[in-house]
C-alpha cells in the first residue's frame, strides 16, 4: 500500500477533524476499545481462519495476503482492537447506555468475508 492508498493513519485524523469542524464532537463520547478475544472473533469467522490469520503475521516487515491486504507485526492487534470497538459499541447500545454508535477504526475490513481476508 503506497502513500496515496486511502487506508492510512491520516484517515482517522481526517474523520476527527471533520467531526470537529461540523460541531458534532460535543455530542460524542469516546471509549477506549478493548482487544476482542479469539473466541469473540470466532463467533463471526471460522476459528481455523482466525488462527491462520494470526499465524500469518510476520515478525518483521510486511506480508501481502492478497494484492490489497498487507499485514505487519502490529496488524492483528489493530484488527482485534477494531473488532473490540464494534463489540463494545454493540454492548453499550444494547445496554441502553448510549443510543447509537459509530466506530472510526483501522483497519476497516469492509471487504472481508467470513473466511477470507480482503482489502
Question: Predicted segments — roles?
Answer:
Residues 1-119:
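HDAC/HDAC-like amidohydrolase catalytic core signature
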Amino acid at each position: 500500500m503506497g502513500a496515496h492508498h486511502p487506508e492510512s493513519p491520516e484517515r482517522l485524523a481526517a474523520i476527527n477533524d471533520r467531526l470537529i469542524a461540523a460541531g458534532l464532537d460535543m455530542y460524542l463520547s469516546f471509549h477506549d476499545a478493548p482487544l476482542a478475544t479469539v473466541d469473540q472473533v470466532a463467533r463471526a469467522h471460522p476459528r481455523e481462519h482466525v488462527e491462520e490469520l494470526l499465524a500469518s503475521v510476520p515478525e518483521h516487515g510486511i506480508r501481502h495476503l492478497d494484492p490489497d491486504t498487507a499485514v505487519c507485526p502490529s496488524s492483528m492487534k489493530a484488527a482485534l482492537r477494531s473488532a473490540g470497538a464494534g463489540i463494545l459499541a454493540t454492548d453499550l447500545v444494547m445496554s441502553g447506555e448510549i443510543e447509537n454508535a459509530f466506530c472510526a477504526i483501522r483497519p476497516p475490513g469492509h471487504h472481508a468475508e467470513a473466511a477470507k481476508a480482503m482489502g
